[in-house]
Amino acid sequence: MMERMGYALILVDVQRNMLVGDTAVDGAAEFTGVLTGLLDAARDAGAAVIHVKNDGRRGDPDEPGAPGWELVFTPLPGEPVVRKDVPNAFESNPALADVLRAMGVDTVVVAGLQSEYCVQATAVGALERGFDVVVPAGAHTTYDDGEPATAIVERVTLELIAAGVAVPELDEVTFG
C-alpha cells in the first residue's frame, strides 16, 4: 500500500517555448524562480509532482520534438510527465485523476502557463473531479493578448476564486 501523500504539484506547460528565448513571457526569469521555489518545496515535503507537457500543432514552438517543447525542469524518477493536446490536462488524460487518487492525493497545487488557458482549465478540471485545488498567487502567468498580461492574470485569479479554488500568497503555500 502506498503512503498517503495528500498533495501534488501540477506544473502546467513549463516548457522552453514560453520561458526561454524570444518567445518567452515577460518576466520569464523571475517567474521561473517562483516555480523553482514551489517545485523545491513540493519535493522537500515529499509531495507528488506531475509535469504537464503541451503537444503543440505542427509548426508551433511547442510541436513535439521542437526545442520549445522541452520541459524547463527535469523530472526526477517517479515524477510523471503527462502530455496533452487540449487545455485541460484531465480531459487529455482521463486516468490522471485516478493516478492522483491512487497516490493518496486529495489536494492539487496548480502552477504554470498560460493563466487563461491551460492553468485555468486544468485547475477547474481538478475541481470537477473532486480535488481541493490551490493556485498560488504569482504562480501562473501569460502573454499580453488584447490586454496586459497582468490584467489577464488578475481576471483569471478572480474567476478561479469564484469557482472554488484557493489562491493563497506564495509564502503561505505548504505541501502537507
Regions found by a protein language model. Name each.
Residues M1-A8, V34-R43, D62-G176:
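Active-site-adjacent betaalpha module
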Residues I10-V14:
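N-terminal nucleotide-binding beta1-loop-alpha1 segment
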Residues Q15, D55, D85:
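Anionic group-transfer/hydrolysis microenvironments
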Residues Q15-G21:
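Short acidic, Gly/Ser-rich segments with clustered Asp/Glu that frequently serve as metal-coordination loops
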Residues G21-D22, P61-E63:
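Short, glycine/acidic-enriched capping/hinge loops at junctions between secondary-structure elements
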Residues T23-H51:
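A short alpha/beta connector and helix-capping loop motif
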Residues N54-D55, L113:
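Short, well-ordered beta-to-alpha junction loops that form the rim of enzyme active sites
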Residues G56-D60:
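Glycine-rich, proline-tolerant flexible connector loops at the mouths of alpha/beta enzymes
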